[in-house]
Amino acid sequence: QGWSENPREALIHNLPQGDLLILDLFAECRPKWGIASIFQNDEGYGQHQWLYCMLENFGGNVGLHGRMDQLLNNFYQTQTNPKAAHLKGIGFTMEGSENNPVMFELMSELPWRPTKFGKEEWLKGYVRARYGTNDPTLQEAWQLLGATIYNCPMGNNQQGPHESIFCGRPSANNFQASSWSKMSNYYDPDDILRAATLFF
């Protein structure tokens, strides 16, 4: 797996090409295959085959969250970057499912689209397919979600949706449950409330 320091170069260097398939576990946020990130490996995976994976969900936490722009930008950089020469497909490495289906739909389309597309246009088709109609109110709601809560920005290493403070240690200023997770509003909560009202 491509995560943090793994796989170490000394471990995989002498393995024959084709004997290893590496999953770049968090490629939508912390790609290890060669582009800038806190997990970056300057040499990518060398001669080894690998999959561009979306982690999206940590610990089965339920809540709205996604990185649409990063998912698209990072994936389409593989088309022209020589470090990605041995990319063989995509993978899903989530620690929980049954949430944020829009992100899984978007990820699933990537191998079928040879040229980069914008999330705004893609969301229009997603709404038509999901609801069987081109309702302007639903379109507005999803465009708002795609620009806010489903668009965690580059540089924000938050691991999925906000954690419940009820799961954290008792404290007067508790804002998260895990010590390693970054919890901050990268969107305006009022935009999410507005989007929610558009669904009714």
Identify what each model region corresponds to.
Residues Q1-G146, N151-Q159, C167-P189, R194:
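Catalytic-core regions of glycoside hydrolase
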Residues T197-F200:
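Short, intrinsically disordered, charge-balanced linker/junction segments flanking boundaries
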